[in-house]
From Swiss-Prot:
GO molecular function annotations of the record: protein-L-isoaspartate (D-aspartate) O-methyltransferase activity
Predominant cellular place of this UniProt entry's protein: cytoplasm
The protein's name: Protein-L-isoaspartate O-methyltransferase
Catalysis: reaction(s): [protein]-L-isoaspartate + S-adenosyl-L-methionine = [protein]-L-isoaspartate alpha-methyl ester + S-adenosyl-L-homocysteine
Native organism: Chlorobaculum parvum (strain DSM 263 / NCIMB 8327) (Chlorobium vibrioforme subsp. thiosulfatophilum)
Amino acid sequence: MQHTDDMVQERRGMVELLRRYGIRNSRVLDAFLTVKRHLFVDGESRMFAYHDSALPIGFGQTISQPYTVAYMMELLVENCSSGKVLEIGTGSGFQAAILDALGYRVFTIECVAGLYELASARFEKLGIPVQSRLGDGTLGWPEEAPFDAIIVTAAAPHEPRELMSQLADGGVLILPLGSLASQQMTVIRRKGNRFEHEGFDHFAFVPLLGREGWPDSDE
């Protein structure tokens, strides 16, 4: 099967699939049409870049399936239409690129040095104005706080208090919360010193590592 360099038709097919799966927000769909996912994977994975599947990106990690990213982005847009966003878990850099395409000011943290280096190089090559750093994402980025939204791309065992403290008043934290086997996508909204929780669908993410994540040796 032959592809053009931009893989426009494949990208349109992916967006149509997301629409059939229930993603309705036009901003989110437009962002997925704009960002070239195949530039965030390497080798043979590129031919599957616009399938709705997770793909290996090295270092034992994967790029999330498009539907999962779109689901989180739709929750974000519906709860925080603009502003400053912190992403926990840069991975390939694809979701940060989507956030940028949505018009947010993006900060992202990765704990795996190799992934951080690859993603940073992609951002520079593609001209994506994302601020990235290597470190423990569960501790957030206090020097840049507060954030209008924080997105966590790995399964959290409990509410990460440090991240919650870095939300602006009215800000939202979106994360998969639960066990190692299954997590509920959760939106936590800050209202002054109170935090409101709302649960959505269930997913299966890799575990969140760090001081407020899962221990390295599972449970």
